[in-house]
A protein has these predicted regions:
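Hydrophobic alpha-helical
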Residues: 21-23, 28, 35-54, 124, ...
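Hydrophobic alpha-helical segments within soluble ligand-binding/sensing domains
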Residues: 76-102, 151, 200, 216-233
Length: 247
């Protein structure tokens, strides 16, 4: 679309700090863009931004996570609940006869980093309730703002739960647990995570992560920009919900 004098400005925010999202949204509004593509944060913070975009007649697109009660021009990403449901099925291929699973989270002020992570966990728990209701699902909340405490918290968890052999995290930082397992020689733990970050892939290759569920972020972004251009330049109708395949 370079022939149409289009340009893209990227603004970043910390997904575990809602103040960071608010600051980034203010910076974006100050630019007076023709359109916005975003990976939204929690609904209550996203809505303040989208309300102002709507008031200014600025179309916006979601990637990564959809917020149904704050509908965008289009959404590109996974069905987060179905993704979590699928992850539970994969987990049970590994768990076999064992009866405990741990969910690892990264939290800030008691809240996970995105609506997407919450929906993945809902889908995961739905599958477990439907098919394996006797399983004990444990939780370990690591602090997003205090990474130096991760190893201590993991040490304490595994001391307290020495028989747990299966775990999952719904954020993109499975490498935190994978690298811990490597450094402590824990080769009998089945770990599932999300996203093809370099450190995640390294853990997959080393064997400390068994499965990575990817969601084609590059294709999400490319399709999102295309949808904005189709809407703004060519006045084409854009499909609202566009689910990406699970890799």
């Amino acid at each position: 679309y370079s022939d149409f004098n289009t340009s893209v400005k990227i603004n970043y925010y910390d997904p575990y700090d809602y103040h960071s999202f608010v600051n980034a949204s203010e910076a974006i509004l100050a630019l007076q863009p023709d359109g916005v593509m975003m990976a939204p944060t929690a609904p209550q913070y996203t809505k303040g931004f989208t309300d102002r975009l709507q008031a200014s007649d600025i179309p916006y697109i979601y990637i990564d996570s959809n917020i149904k009660n704050v509908p965008p021009l289009a959404f590109f990403g996974q069905n987060s609940r179905q993704s979590g449901y699928f992850a539970a099925r994969m987990m049970m291929l590994l768990a076999r006869d064992e009866k405990e699973i741990v969910i690892f989270r990264k939290i800030h002020e008691g809240i996970v980093g995105s609506n997407q992570q919450e929906n993945r966990e809902i889908g995961f728990r739905q599958y477990m309730e439907e098919h394996h209701p006797s399983y004990n699902i444990l939780e370990l909340d690591l602090h997003a703002e205090r990474n130096d405490e991760d190893n201590e918290m993991l040490d304490e968890f595994f001391r307290s739960h020495p028989t747990v052999k299966n775990g999952i995290t719904f954020n993109s930082k499975v490498y935190i647990i994978g690298e811990y397992l490597q450094s402590h020689g824990k080769k009998d733990f089945n770990l599932i995570g999300y996203d093809l970050l370099d450190r995640n892939v390294a853990c997959l290759k080393e064997g400390s992560v068994f499965f990575l569920i990817a969601q084609q972020p590059e294709l999400q972004g490319a399709n999102g920009i295309k949808a904005l251009c189709d809407h703004l330049i060519f006045k084409k109708e854009v499909t609202c919900i566009n689910y990406m395949p699970i890799d």
